[in-house]
Amino acid sequence: MAGMKEIRGKIKSVQNTRKITKAMEMVAASKMRRAQERMRAARPYAEKVRAIAAHMSRANPEYRHPFMVANEGVKTAGMILVTTDKGLCGGLNTNVLRASLQKFKELEEKGQKVEATAIGGKGLGFLNRFGAKVISQVVHLGDTPHLDKLIGAVKTQLDLYSEGRLSAVYLAYTRFVNTMKQETVIEQLLPLSSEHFDANDGTPATSWDYIYEPDAQAVVDELLVRYVEALVYQAVAENMASEQSARMVAMKAASDNAKTVISELQLSYNKSRQAAITKELSEIVGGAAAV
């Protein structure tokens, strides 16, 4: 009977755990939908800023913003690492951290040191354990990222690049593909390549004309900063949507596994109970036969 009592305790424990994982699955599903809406809402802003900056760059080919010029001979690179603040989201953080570590090693092999910006507590913890130089950080963003919380940390990297102290700035995050699939991405944020300003939106280069105040150069300077900030914000929004999707899938898998364990424990309990009843009946029959 002690075995049956122990099994009942295990069943109760797993049932309680399943209630928690099921609740977390539903919460993650709700947050995922909101995160996807924010992610989609951020895309038109970044695209419109890109289109305007592209038009102005074509209209003023003689001016090259520092973000569009490679800093040759510099032995330090920047890395903006976007992760989550919380765990329980499958291998999402592990994948981006592994890819970032590989990028660190590649840069070191080329004689490049790395100065990192951490967005998210998991990435900050990784960088500290790895011994990387962290020059800025943002943690505890919550479920709704705000650009004003990111600007300070991101500006540190942008200023260093503008001053010619970084050879490049890389952005590492998890891109949202769909609920079941997320991709680890490490892309070059600075210097901006010509791909950022290709006329792929179907708008002819001569289709608009503006009067720029105070002058076109000042507007380009401000626009490119806003564009890079929008790229980072988009990466954070994509990462948050990926986080909630991965957490929902992980919690669903945990709930399904708990259900399987409960079924197996219930079967063990029934077998133990049947064995105990059979033993009691055998003892009764044996006692009656002895009489």
UniProtKB/Swiss-Prot annotation:
Molecular function via GO: ATP binding; proton-transporting ATP synthase activity, rotational mechanism
A GO term from the CC aspect: proton-transporting ATP synthase complex
Subcellular location: Cell inner membrane
Gene3D superfamilies according to UniProt: 3.40.1380.10, ATP synthase, gamma subunit, helix hairpin domain (1.10.287.80)
Alphabetized Pfam families for the sequence: ATP-synt (PF00231)
Keywords of this entry: ATP synthesis, Cell inner membrane, Cell membrane, CF(1), Hydrogen ion transport, Ion transport, Membrane, Transport
NCBIfam families linked: ATPsyn_F1gamma, PRK05621.1-1
PANTHER family (UniProt xref): ATP SYNTHASE GAMMA CHAIN, ATP SYNTHASE SUBUNIT GAMMA, MITOCHONDRIAL
HAMAP family on file: ATP_synth_gamma_bact
Free-text function comment from the UniProt entry: Produces ATP from ADP in the presence of a proton gradient across the membrane. The gamma chain is believed to be important in regulating ATPase activity and the flow of protons through the CF(0) complex.
Family statement drawn from the similarity comment of this UniProt entry: Belongs to the ATPase gamma chain family.
Record note on quaternary structure: F-type ATPases have 2 components, CF(1) - the catalytic core - and CF(0) - the membrane proton channel. CF(1) has five subunits: alpha(3), beta(3), gamma(1), delta(1), epsilon(1). CF(0) has three main subunits: a, b and c.
Protein name (Swiss-Prot/TrEMBL): ATP synthase gamma chain
